């Protein structure tokens, strides 16, 4: 980010938003809002550092979410006030008579997903999973029991310690073994909504899988 810079929430001023509305737009679609994996170090602000081996590029993929309840610090002028800056942007957009759309990524998350900003009482994705089972309808992820994550790439990525994950989790593009290839979404983990892909896609929806409730709560958080 020090080399290339990044647009900020605050850059979309009232006058900019008004000009968008005057061109006939009814909504603005802000992409990359939810916090995702990056190689930029924000540990001074209490944000965990992501292992570089599982971040694509330096800025990371905006679809490798690390916290569904947070916004991306790259987009804030004051990192510690990042959510307030986003909320102020939404308010400016509404005042300019524009609806607001953001990306919701329901299929997968980053490999080091940990929510710092989740509301009280909310359990993290994967926190209660039975990792000894490749598939369990109440798990949030899919696992490769007994196998560590062994992608095609160097898991050190210039660091002293390699990235380690055991059991390995399935990728967001449905690679269900522990050795994703160059064309796989190796930096992501697929979410389990109760479909057993190991058995040909059989669905288990009664009782309702836990992931559905967690994702419902995330949607309600943003809709509010």
Could you tell me what each predicted segment is?
Residues 1-99, 107-109, 114-117, 129, ...:
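N-terminal structural segment of carbohydrate-active enzymes
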């Amino acid at each position: 980010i020090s080399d290339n810079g990044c647009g900020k929430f605050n850059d979309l001023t009232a006058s900019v938003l008004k000009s968008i509305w005057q061109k006939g737009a009814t909504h603005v679609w802000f992409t990359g809002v939810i916090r995702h994996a990056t190689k930029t170090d924000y540990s001074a602000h209490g944000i965990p550092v992501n292992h570089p081996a599982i971040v694509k590029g330096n800025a990371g993929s905006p679809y490798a979410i690390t916290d569904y309840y947070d916004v991306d610090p790259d987009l804030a002028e004051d990192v510690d006030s990042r959510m307030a800056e986003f909320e102020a942007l939404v308010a400016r957009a509404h005042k300019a008579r524009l609806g607001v759309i953001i990306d919701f990524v329901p299929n997968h998350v980053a490999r080091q997903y940990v929510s710092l900003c989740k509301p009280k009482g909310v359990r993290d994705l994967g926190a209660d999973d039975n990792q000894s089972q490749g598939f369990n309808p109440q798990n949030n992820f899919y696992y490769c029991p007994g196998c560590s994550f062994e992608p095609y790439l160097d898991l050190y990525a210039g660091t002293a310690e390699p990235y380690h994950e055991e059991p390995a989790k399935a990728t967001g593009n449905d690679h269900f073994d522990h050795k994703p290839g160059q064309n796989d979404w190796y930096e992501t983990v697929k979410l389990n909504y109760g479909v057993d892909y190991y058995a040909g896609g059989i669905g288990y929806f009664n009782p309702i899988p836990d992931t559905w409730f967690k994702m419902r709560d995330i949607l309600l958080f943003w809709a509010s």
